[in-house]
Amino acid sequence: MKLSHLALVELLQKAYSAERAAAFAYIGHAGSLKAADAKMAVKKIEDDEWEHRENILRLMEQYEVPISRAYEVRFYVIGKIISASCYVIGRFMPFFFAGKLESGNVCEYFRMMQHFHSLGIREHDEMLYAMGMKEKEHEVYFLEQIKTDRLLPLFERLFSWGSGKTANDVNLENKIPVGNSDQYCKPSDERR
């Protein structure tokens, strides 16, 4: 079945390429860290990003969505630049910006689910839910690493993400079940 839902096609293409950029960034991030446990944690997050990319590719193949060459090139370059920069920008910024990025990524998967639902397709709910929750776990991990850093209040004000600010409405302590999770990541006027 070929998708004719342009917003969903674009979201799949962008997410597919952005997952590779994130994985590249985490290679540099892990490499720049000194503590073995932190290196392993970021490496695990990198592995999750590669797995998400594979899952998205399967969806794209199932619905005949072509890979966007433009996104692939753009996000390849972005990922490599971020990866290299991790070695020179200190400890705080890679954790902060990774957390901010993951915060936005959470909603990608719930928006995909909403778009699929608009087409009457629910067979991917479990996978999309799991990927959205995994991105939230990543966000929480990165914030935990910098929660006491003296730079956090300044960066939180400048970039609208941190201890009191997030780009999604997912709460790992009070998860909405998969069957109702299309409530996540809607504009506030659409939430019930």
What positions do the PLM features span?
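Non-heme di-metal
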Residues: 1-192
